[in-house]
Amino acid sequence: MSNSSRNATEQNNKCSAAGVNSVAAALCPLSNCQFSGVVISAIADEQKLEFNNIYKSSCTLSCSYDSQGVLVRIMLDNDQGHVLKEYMLSADTDAAQLGKRSYAVSLESDNLVLRFASDKDQQLFRKVVENVKHLRPKSVFSQRTEESSASQYFQFYGYLSQQQNMMQDYVRTSTYQRAILGNSIDFQDKIVLDVGAGSGILSFFAVQAGAAKVYAIEASNMAQYAQQLVESNNVQHKISVIPGKIEEIELPEKVDVIISEPMGYMLYNERMLETYLHARKWLKPQGKMYPTHGDLHIAPFSDDSLYSEQYNKANFWYQSAFHGVDLTTLHKEGMKEYFRQPIVDTFDIRICMAKSVRHVCDFLNDKENDLHLIDIPLEFHILQTGICHGLAFWFDVEFSGSTQNVWLSTSPTAPLTHWYQVRCLLPMPIFIKQGQTLTGRVLLEANRRQSYDVTIDLHIEGTLISSSNTLDLKNPYFRYTGAPVQAPPGTNTQSPSEQYWTQMDTQQQQQGSRNSNSMLNGGLSVNGMADPGMDINLGLMHPH
């Protein structure tokens, strides 16, 4: 028996002894389960049962739990650091045993034959398939989300005040309405699905555009308030509010259009986009998605003030005599915690040191799995010399309609929204010169707290200079105060003092010119109106 199969057997026995009948327990033997020495073939001729080896050498199959079943990764035995292919093993996977060591399995669009190194390995893999097929988890959502996180999430969106905060975002709400009403041809007499409907405002827009029926899905307590709005506006024959998660509910029919507002900070936070993509199972072929795709923009920035602010906060823990207590042992952890916080605020785009890199998420075609691990390569051509303190993030989404395309932007050059922008600091900033190239990557790794761990890795090309950081998108620092955005230092090309006095002189000259014109006209000016024929002496009292 191989070490991998022995480990899987031991884990299987432990779970059986525990007698736990949960999804996690049922999948327990799959944890860190690997099968080495597997020969993978494709069916070349079904009638003659002829097979062709896909890879030149034997492979290792790695099986790990995923929210949709089991993720199977294929690697070469002699190069396990490189994943050749990934497949999702789900309850719908077709599979069959072929003899004692082989197994035929249909994974996505590939029909494969797996020949294992031993009978025992084949039996264990068959157990993997059987476990997945017998699982009927409550929902994809419940598998990817901690119960405590889900509870807080739906409680938060169940408050009217939070719905009001989003509805009063004029840019957000008006852009959605314009996108829907401006493409009424996509909604006229159509069946519409509103995912995460909240108050139902988008459902009302769909009805305004002529929708025949709207299914408004809302998992929080806000569903009851949405129902009240539907009834008070007499559109209950048009809008059907369905309490629940889209991953769990059933619709009576397929839909023509899906509408939703699934974006979070940095586009991906809250993992609502996965729910939005999951809803496509109810979308008719050639159906529409509003919005259609999202662009995440990333740019290096320089901001000494922000960096110093966070650094000085952490220095609280550098005190050796705080009320007689030495805190310095926690300074390193304090520094780490503050720099793990993404900063949510807004800024002048002139702090960006290069043109932003754009990463596209295609809501019509991307899969939910694509959002579990998002790897974004970076290459910036630096436009100004300075200190790079980290990366700035914002996003745009496009509504691609049949009549017109409409964009909703959270760029620092666009009107401010409740998404603001997000900045991720480097604990060790790097000095970079104009003309140099900054390369690296951003890795967004989904977690069960409905958020992402964000890893930044930057390197100045042609040097040994690099810097990195990992941040917790679930725990941002909300820095926005409402104060006007200040221009970055060094952007004045003229004396601000002289500019001010010149402006004052100009205003005084203009005022003097207006007064002179009034006197020359010989009239009395009242609220800017004058009668040139009026005698200004009339009505004046003279001493006797």
UniProtKB/Swiss-Prot annotation:
The dimethylated protein is the major form. Its EC number is 2.1.1.319. The modification Asymmetric dimethylarginine is found at R514. SUPFAM superfamilies: S-adenosyl-L-methionine-dependent methyltransferases. GO terms for molecular function: histone H3R17 methyltransferase activity; histone H3R2 methyltransferase activity; histone H3R26 methyltransferase activity; protein-arginine omega-N asymmetric methyltransferase activity; protein-arginine omega-N monomethyltransferase activity. GO terms for cellular component: cytoplasm; cytosol; histone methyltransferase complex; nucleus. Residues 505-520 have a biased composition (Polar residues). Residues 505-527 are annotated as: Disordered. The keyword Cell division does not apply. Pfam families: PrmA, PRMT_C. It catalyses: L-arginyl-[protein] + 2 S-adenosyl-L-methionine = N(omega),N(omega)-dimethyl-L-arginyl-[protein] + 2 S-adenosyl-L-homocysteine + 2 H(+). S-adenosyl-L-methionine binds at Q163, R172, G196, E218, E247, T275. It comes from the Eukaryota. Keywords: Chromatin regulator, Cytoplasm, Methylation, Methyltransferase, Nucleus, S-adenosyl-L-methionine, Transcription, Transcription regulation, Transferase. The keyword Ubl conjugation does not apply. Residues 150-459 form the SAM-dependent MTase PRMT-type domain. It is found in: Cytoplasm; Nucleus. One of its GO terms (biological process) is chromatin remodeling. Methylates (mono- and asymmetric dimethylation) the guanidino nitrogens of arginyl residues in proteins. May methylate histone H3 at 'Arg-17' and activate transcription via chromatin remodeling. Homodimer. Belongs to the class I-like SAM-binding methyltransferase superfamily. Protein arginine N-methyltransferase family. This is Histone-arginine methyltransferase CARMER. It comes from Drosophila grimshawi (Hawaiian fruit fly).
